[in-house]
């Protein structure tokens, strides 16, 4: 299970907590880079495995599922160009939890043609319809409308209701400059 290689805190972390709490599987690992600030936090939940280590690659090759909130190549195809030689021997399913709700058409990057996703989680009906009926090329059985794992962790507030306005901006590529590598 993973979020990004350097941090937890997204849907992968909440799915990992859910699996450990409800199934207590000893063979479930959360993947993070060696010097991530989240290692201590995640280690309290379960086993942490470090990205791009021999142990990581061996566990990946022998895994039944790879579950992540991100579908970048370092997670989805960690062997890079060597994947074509290794992938025929790997019988695992990739579960894409997503990071957020898809607003724009991402099918030129996120389609069955480019990503071998076995289960694609959607969290809104409009998003589900867009993916199922759009150019993503996934079989309808691959797409599930379940909501995001981190939303399941929201606490029920049983105190007196308050009138609160929450301003929650989201990231948009059109609002930022170029990507800074680092």
PLM regions with names:
Residues 47-51, 61, 65-76, 82-153:
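Active-site-proximal region of nucleotide-activated glycan assembly enzymes
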Residues 9-13, 39-43, 77-80, 106-108, ...:
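A short acidic (Asp/Glu
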Residues 22-24, 42-44, 88-90, 137-139, ...:
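Short, structurally constrained coil/turn elements
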Residues 1-3, 69-71, 98, 148, ...:
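Short loop/turn segments at strand-loop or loop-helix junctions that form parts
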Residues 26, 63, 92, 162-163:
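Short coil/turn segments at beta-strand junctions that form active-site/ligand-binding loops
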